[in-house]
Amino acid sequence: MFDPRDKQLGDLETVYSAFMETLKNLASEKFLASLGDWTPRDIAAHFVGWNRITLVGCSELREGVEPFYFYDGTNDYRKINARFLEQFPSTDRDELLKEITVTKDALVAYLKTIPESEWELDTGIVHYRGNPATIARCVDSLVRDYPKHRQEILDAFGTD
């Protein structure tokens, strides 16, 4: 259903790099400018948090435990995302970019320890949208989220 581990991890690195380049090239005054519901700063905090909890969620799945954040899935993770904005309040772009990198690197280092045989293993946990919740599915969520939010910034500010 999903790509093999190394392909997905390569895709994650690609979309992460593109997102980071967009944030680095963004004019400083636009980092805190509104995109409607949030700002590029908020999106950066969002990724610091999601990199961290994706690692935890993958670890929980390996133990056959539902990831703690699934409770908020039908709410589009609004409670989880709001918590990240409070938990990571910095408005310093360089600090947040560094934290995204540190948390992404920790996630990828952990994911590289997972055998391919466990990548799409069904441990009995069902994703709130149906079908098995797997490590591959968790990684796929990030692989789709980075470009989605990058495009949101590009659409608002025409930067690239």
Q: What name fits each language-model region?
A:
Residues E13, L23-L26, N131-P132:
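Short hydrophobic/aromatic segments of transmembrane alpha-helices and their interfaces
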Residues K79-E120:
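Acidic/histidine-rich alpha-helical segments that form the ligand environment
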Residues L9-G10, K30-K79, E120-D160:
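Short, contiguous alpha-helical
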Residues E21-A33:
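A short, compositionally biased N-terminal segment around positions ~18-40 that is enriched
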Residues M1-S17:
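Extreme N-terminal tail/first-helix region
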Residues F2-D6, T91-L97, C138-V139:
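Active-site rim elements
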Residues Y16-K24, N51-L55, S59, T101-P115, ...:
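Structural signal for well-ordered, non-membrane alpha-helices
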